[in-house]
Each structure stands twice: as structure tokens, then as C-alpha cells.
């Protein structure tokens, strides 16, 4: 178990429900917001030695108190069990109907569904330069295997972000990422470059918030798109966390691509356990298949909770409603993740 996870669970059992500052520590989905909440909450107050040590260690990762003495690496290797709706990257097991035309797919290219076991490897690096100025790099790789179909697939990604504090409550983040997925039938690659402006705020009636305005340049195997991103994260006075994400993409000629997407996220401590819920609504359009326009509406719901310091459960459901029935889809997700 890495040092940050140890810190989290020490706080989980010792600080839960005691003050607003406990929310700053427990709701760590947004590191910058969590640290801002901490600094504002403990200013002018006396804290015990252990709490001060934990807070200092956390804030050093963002460049406070002299920052990290050297570049900090952390790694984790963990399995999970999940359900995949398309293990081999195949096509739906139904005919494609376009007007009066009907097409049948090759049975060898039909998608496979079922339980998969996955081995995941993560490596994270943090280097600090000054208060609020740091470089974060995240590496990820995984291999998933289905015993039922004797088949598997791999994922790999790298993301690097430079964060620069330009004012007491404002920062600029520049990020670049590359990802790849290899399946038996299909392969997908994507790249993105983003520029984000962040603003931190405190409202005595609501709590601590971070608003972000971002520009994203996204490129996949088949199209390139520019996107506008807006987000608003809040650690509420009532000790719960909320997040709103809105993303809008420019039209892409003759390619199905994001038109807009909205995600709502919530986290709260219930019965001494952190519980998170997410709701997503996405609309994609612009696609054309044999002269027929295609647009998709995707709705997702996700639920996540910790069942122990080293295990979490994720439940979810995805529904896709397409203007071309062939691409309609719906599937559940259920996974158990164990870390050490």
C-alpha cells in the first residue's frame, strides 16, 4: 500500500466527522481543491502533532514547505475482476438495417462478452519546483483476460501535466496524454493536449470550490476535434463532495464525434464509508454510414465504495441509443479492485 493510501485511511478513521478540515482530507478527488480547503480550514488553529505531520506531507506534494526533496515515484500492481461488453473489439450480433437494405455480419467478427480478470500496473511521478508549481506524470498498463473466450486485450496510457500557480487562487495546467488499446479484432489510439485555467474560491454558505475552463485538442485514429471543457468541484460545508463537468466538441465532418457531454459526481461518508455516485449524459453526432446520418445518446451511471483499506467495488450501467439501431447497446459493469 502506498504512503498516500496509508495517510488516507489514518485520516478516515481518526478525523471523520470532526470538522470541515476532515472533509478536505477525505474528499481527495481534486488534490488542489483539497489542499486549498486544508490551508483555509486550519489557518490560525491549533492541530495535534500527527495531524500536522500528515497535512505537511500532503502539502509538500504541491510545493509547500519547501516541496519534495527529490522526484517522488510511487507504483502499484493490483488485480481486478470485471465484466466486459466487448472483449475482442467485434461487431454487434445483429443485422445492420439501413432503410430497405439489410446486412449480416461475419460470425468471426461478432463481439464477445463476459467476465474478465485484469492485472493493472500504475506508476506515478511528482517533481515540485515551487509553491503550486509541479510536474505530474502518470503511467498505466493493463492486460485483461477472459477464461470463457480464451481471449484478452491490453491497455496502455501516459499522461503528463505541468501545473503553475500564477496567483494566490489561480493556476494554469498544461497536460498531454497518449493512450492505446489492442484487441483481437480492433485497435484504438488517441492523443490529447489540454490547457486549463483554474480558480479557487470559498463561500461561507457552500464551502470550498474550484472552477476550471479548459481547451482540449483531441486526436483519435479517425478524427481530430477541438473541445471546450468547464468544471466546478466543491467540498461542501456539510461534508460532501460534488463535481460538475461539461464538455462541448466542435462538429467533425462525416465522423461520429462528441457534441456535448455532462457528468455529475457526488461523494459522501455514509456509515463510516466513503460512497461515490456519477451520472453521465453524452450526445455524439456527425456520423454517416452509407448515406444515413448517425447520432448516439449515451447515458451512464456509476457507483463506487471502499469495502476495506485495500479493496473497492464499482457498479455501473451504460445505455447507448443510436439513430441507427445496429449501434444500440446496453450493458452492466461490476468490478472488484484490490490494491496492495
Predicted regions and their residues:
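Classical Sec-dependent N-terminal signal peptides that target proteins to the secretory pathway
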Residues: 1-24
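Outer-membrane beta-barrel initiation region
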Residues: 23-159
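Transmembrane beta-strands of outer-membrane beta-barrel pores
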Residues: 79-85, 127, 141-147, 176-184, ...
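Outer-membrane beta-barrel transmembrane domain signature
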Residues: 91-99, 237-243, 247-300, 304-306, ...
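Residues that define the transmembrane beta-barrel architecture of outer-membrane proteins
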Residues: 113-121, 143, 150-158, 187-193, ...
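Outer-membrane beta-barrel architecture
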Residues: 122-126, 159-161, 194-198, 227-233, ...
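Repeated loop/turn-to-beta-strand initiation elements of outer-membrane beta-barrel proteins
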Residues: 129-137, 165-176, 200-211, 235-244, ...
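Outer-membrane beta-barrel "beta-signal"
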Residues: 312-316, 327-340
Amino acid at each position: 500500500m502506498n504512503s498516500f493510501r496509508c495517510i488516507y485511511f489514518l485520516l478516515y478513521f481518526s478525523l471523520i466527522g470532526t470538522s470541515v478540515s476532515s472533509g478536505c482530507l477525505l474528499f481527495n478527488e481534486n488534490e488542489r481543491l483539497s489542499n486549498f480547503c486544508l490551508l483555509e480550514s486550519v489557518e490560525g488553529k491549533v492541530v495535534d502533532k500527527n495531524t500536522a505531520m500528515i497535512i505537511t506531507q500532503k502539502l509538500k506534494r504541491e510545493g509547500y514547505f519547501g516541496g519534495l526533496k527529490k522526484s517522488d515515484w510511487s507504483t502499484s500492481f493490483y488485480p481486478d475482476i470485471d465484466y466486459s461488453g466487448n472483449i475482442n473489439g467485434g461487431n454487434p450480433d445483429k443485422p445492420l438495417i439501413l432503410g430497405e437494405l439489410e446486412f449480416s455480419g461475419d460470425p468471426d467478427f461478432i463481439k464477445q462478452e463476459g467476465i474478465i480478470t485484469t492485472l493493472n500496473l500504475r506508476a506515478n511521478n511528482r517533481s515540485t519546483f515551487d509553491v503550486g508549481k509541479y510536474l505530474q506524470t502518470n503511467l498505466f498498463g493493463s492486460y485483461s483476460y477472459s477464461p470463457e473466450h480464451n481471449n484478452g486485450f491490453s491497455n496502455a496510457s501516459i499522461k503528463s501535466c505541468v501545473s503553475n500557480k500564477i496567483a494566490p487562487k489561480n493556476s494554469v495546467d498544461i497536460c498531454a496524454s497518449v493512450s492505446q488499446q489492442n484487441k483481437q479484432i480492433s485497435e484504438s489510439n488517441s492523443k490529447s493536449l489540454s490547457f486549463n485555467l483554474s480558480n479557487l474560491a470559498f463561500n461561507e454558505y457552500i464551502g470550498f470550490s474550484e472552477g476550471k475552463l479548459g481547451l482540449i485538442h483531441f486526436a483519435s485514429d479517425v478524427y481530430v476535434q477541438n473541445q471546450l471543457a468547464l468544471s466546478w468541484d466543491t467540498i461542501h460545508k456539510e461534508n460532501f463532495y460534488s463535481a460538475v463537468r461539461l464538455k462541448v466538441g466542435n462538429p467533425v465532418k462525416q465522423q461520429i464525434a462528441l457534441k456535448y457531454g455532462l457528468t455529475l459526481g457526488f461523494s459522501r461518508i455514509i456509515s463510516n464509508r466513503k460512497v461515490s455516485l456519477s451520472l453521465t449524459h453524452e450526445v455524439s453526432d456527425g456520423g454517416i454510414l452509407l448515406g444515413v446520418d448517425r447520432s448516439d445518446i449515451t447515458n451512464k451511471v456509476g457507483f463506487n465504495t471502499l469495502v476495506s483499506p485495500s479493496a473497492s467495488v464499482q457498479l455501473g450501467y451504460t445505455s447507448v441509443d443510436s439513430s441507427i439501431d445496429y449501434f444500440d447497446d446496453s450493458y452492466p459493469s461490476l468490478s472488484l479492485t484490490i490494491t496492495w
